[in-house]
């Protein structure tokens, strides 16, 4: 939970959101990508009213839009195998995120806990894509976003 801009912000999985909020994001994406020119076209394509779009458009953003130029702190659970942390760091480097801090606990029971703080200003992909790529590395058990500034 974060407090900014006169309100409290939450990170919520899209599965928990009402359809009207998801349609708002979809309409905004259509406009952003230039697939439609007007808001009227966008809301018609996604099947929502213009009044609902205007009501929510300033209050919902994909996580990657909120995180551009921010500091993200992640917690990773990795199997204690040679080279896994290196692969994770290589993936971060490929995304052009900047590692600000990294902390690793002593591995116990074959598991290593890692905390990584990233500066996202120069990232060439969004944070969700980076997490998906890191999750595909053999030995990465779990990744959570702990904080964002």
Curated annotation (Swiss-Prot):
Residues 73-148 form the ACT domain. PROSITE patterns: ACT (PS51671). InterPro entries: ACT-like_dom_sf, ACT_dom, UPF0735_ACT_dom-cont. SUPFAM superfamilies: ACT-like (SSF55021). HAMAP family: UPF0735. Belongs to the UPF0735 family. This is UPF0735 ACT domain-containing protein Amet_0565. It comes from Alkaliphilus metalliredigens (strain QYMF).
